[in-house]
Amino acid sequence: MKKQLLIIAASLSLIPVGNLFAQQNQTFIKNTETVIAKNISHNNHNESLMESGDKKYSSKDYRGAITDYSKILLNNPNDYYALFQRALSKSYLNDHEGAIQDYTRAIQINPEKASAFYNRGLSKDKLKDFYGAI
């Protein structure tokens, strides 16, 4: 009988611990949901900026495109596409030094993309860096 009472008492003493874990779990779930919602919001914002930048680029508003791509890069500095498109826009504005910096970063992020090497070479050629263009 004493053994049963001891087991019951021990079991009852664990209830507050279980409640504490349940509360911590609920807090964790709420925090996770908040982080996910913020990430979705950032992704939607970046997609809108990407569309806006692409439209501006297509309509030859290169300064506007650079602004949009730069905003994307503030949230995601390793976005290859935004870097590459910003570099192209800078090239069209004859900012070849800025374009070379962006192409170089794009190459560091994805060295498999030959187009960044090619376009960086074109910008170096425009700056009369013929050896660097090769």
What do the PLM-derived regions correspond to, one by one?
Residues 2-134:
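Alpha-helical tetratricopeptide repeat
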